[in-house]
Amino acid sequence: MEEFQGYFELDRXRQHDFLYPLLFREYIYALAHDHGLNRSILFKNAGYDKKSSSIVVKRLITRMYQQNPLIFSANDSIQNPFFGHNKNLYSQIISEGFAVIVEIPFSLRLVSSLERKEIAKSHNLRSIHSIFPFLEDKFSHLDYVSDVLIPYHIHLEILVQTLRYWVKDASSLHLLRFFLHEYWNSLITPKKHIILFSKGNPRLFLFLYNSHICEYESIFLFLRNQSSHLRSTSSGIFFERIYFYVKIEHFAKVFFDNDFQCILWFFKDPFMHYVRYQGKSILASKDTPLLMNKWKYYLVTLWQYHFYAWFQPGRIDINQLCKYSLDFLGYRSSVRLNSSVVRSQMLENSFLINNAMKKFETIVPIIPLIGSLSKANFCNTLGHPISKPTRADSSDSDIIDRFLRICRNLSHYHSGSSKKKSLYRVKYILRLSCVKTLARKHKRTVRTFFKRLGSEFLEXFLTEEEVVLSLIFPRTYSTSRRLYRGQIWYLDITSINDLVNYE
């Protein structure tokens, strides 16, 4: 963000009014290129030319406002390499610059909010692992849970209207609306709906989707605060809105009866918790199924009448936490009852006390993980390691380093597992697959290669956690081993490995 501030040097209070002129500045596309925003789509293939980028954008916007936006002269294709490519490339040029521009007000507002609330180490909140300590702390005291699939068929006009509450630049919004209608078929699908979580989606459309989800969660947060004894304060930094409460009151008057406020305060729910991940959300509560059905009704009404998205009530299931497992973010999470029997003796009488305590457990689902390893040609569908085809010019050290990197990344991500047995099996598959790959390259047997590599090869597959803990506790080996076998959550994990993403 310091780089953004250095480039633009605009007053924060007026920054959202000057977005459209930035679209024709050279440094916008330099930022998009230098920060790696989809560089493989545009700049790596077509080449980046600072002197001609703004000229290209001006011509594209001019032709987009005309009847035939893709009529280019022969001189254009000769003078500029951009015009020698297809329509997708032209739309990518504008979307790249527009994505950088519209993110500026959001980013600066978030930074100022974090500074005002004096929240240190806010980057830790972005870690995927930061969700699980929250679940460990809260879910062991809850009873019911709903795993909700957030509707993703969103009309493009609703996306523009949602962004209008954040960006007050009419020219930028008009250009965005025209751009979406013009290039929608070439960028997404022939239908006017977004297909989410696809690697081919531009950054701009992911930004529009996230702003739409922010709109939904803002309303959901308002409803939650109105119906709860406990007011939520920690989420305020993520849901700053302009004219937010005015819109909420209008929403309540139109789609609910006059007793809406009374209904909210009648059903007090102090233990409603919400978690969102990968286009899904989790609702958990300590109260009865009646209150869970209340929130189910709220969500269905919210999506159908406010966002015009068809949402079937049957897609929201209400389950008991003690009988249900949640599969998300590469883990299988559940709440289990752990019984402990204590024998007590008082004078001549002795009796047994059976204590049942709830514990939140997270394990590695081995079957989906083996399926991912099978698709990546590390093993077959039964989990038996196989040799992986490699390039002829790959050295042995490169092959070993590649397998070690994959093994350590998986171990690092799954360090929070309650049980390590599945993780040990994954290590075994990767280790033996590495040996078979080397043996196949040198046309030797696996046994011969094991003897050649020796015990040092097995030690190389020690995870980063084991090495670090052994350095911290050099004289207490049992302590480091016990800590490693426990759950460790890291706050530096911001992305999911492709082998872990089963969705």
From Swiss-Prot:
MF (Gene Ontology): RNA binding
Localisation per UniProt entry: Plastid, Chloroplast
Name the record gives this protein: Maturase K
Main location: plastid
Keywords from the named record: Chloroplast, mRNA processing, Plastid, RNA-binding, tRNA processing
Disulfide bridges in this chain: none
Role: Usually encoded in the trnK tRNA gene intron. Probably assists in splicing its own and other chloroplast group II introns.
Organism per entry: Syzygium australe (Brush cherry)
GO cellular component term of the entry, any: chloroplast
Keyword Metal-binding annotated: no
GO biological process: mRNA processing; RNA splicing; tRNA processing
Keyword Chloroplast: yes
HAMAP family to which the protein is assigned, alphabetical: MatK
Family statement drawn from the similarity comment of this UniProt entry: Belongs to the intron maturase 2 family. MatK subfamily.
